[in-house]
Amino acid sequence: MFLLHTMIRVGDLDKSLQFYCDILGMNLLRKKDYPSGEFTLAFVGYGKESENAVIELTHNWGTDKYDLGNGFGHIALGVEDIYSTCDKIRDKGGKVVREPGPMKHGTTVIAFVEDPDGYKIELIQTSSKKD
């Protein structure tokens, strides 16, 4: 058994693709419209679906906003240089909602960014580099 993907519903697929692909550097792996169901699925990730878990972006036509609730926490991404990554995200128009620094009660360096729908993306420093 292995993880294939996680699905999130998005209100504006173009904005979400711009965020995940242009700002976070993922690739659009595949995209398909389902006219009879009035939805579009787009899969994004950093590598082939056969070798990596990916994110499924589901856009239900005619729905532009979702209640994110309080059950879902975040998606986590490992980065080598969290400080420059946050700078690049900001430069491309992304929203850093928690600046890089040690996590509470620990030493792991983390930051949080937010996608166009308000989903939180945690960035975790994977190397020992700290500014």
Swiss-Prot record:
Gene3D superfamilies associated with the record: 2,3-Dihydroxybiphenyl 1,2-Dioxygenase, domain 1
Cofactor: Ni(2+)
GO molecular function: lactoylglutathione lyase activity; metal ion binding
EC number: 4.4.1.5
Positions in coiled-coil regions: none
Sorted UniProt keywords: Lyase, Metal-binding, Nickel
SUPFAM superfamilies from the UniProt entry: Glyoxalase/Bleomycin resistance protein/Dihydroxybiphenyl dioxygenase
Listed pathway(s): Secondary metabolite metabolism; methylglyoxal degradation; (R)-lactate from methylglyoxal: step 1/2
Domain annotation VOC: ranges: 2-126
Residues forming the catalytic site: E122
Binding-site residues, substrate: R9, N60, H74
Binding note for cofactor: Binds 1 nickel ion per subunit.
Catalytic activity of the protein: (R)-S-lactoylglutathione = methylglyoxal + glutathione
Enzyme class of the recorded protein, top EC level: lyase
The keyword Transmembrane appears for this protein: no
Binding site for Ni(2+): H5, E56, H74, E122
Highest taxon of the lineage: Bacteria
Keyword Transmembrane helix: no
Disulfide bonds: none
Gene Ontology CC: one annotated term: cytoplasm
GO biological process: methylglyoxal catabolic process to D-lactate via S-lactoyl-glutathione
Purpose: Catalyzes the conversion of hemimercaptal, formed from methylglyoxal and glutathione, to S-lactoylglutathione.
Family: Belongs to the glyoxalase I family.
Protein name per its UniProtKB record: Probable lactoylglutathione lyase
Naturally occurring in which organism (per UniProt): Synechocystis sp. (strain ATCC 27184 / PCC 6803 / Kazusa)
Gene name of the record: gloA
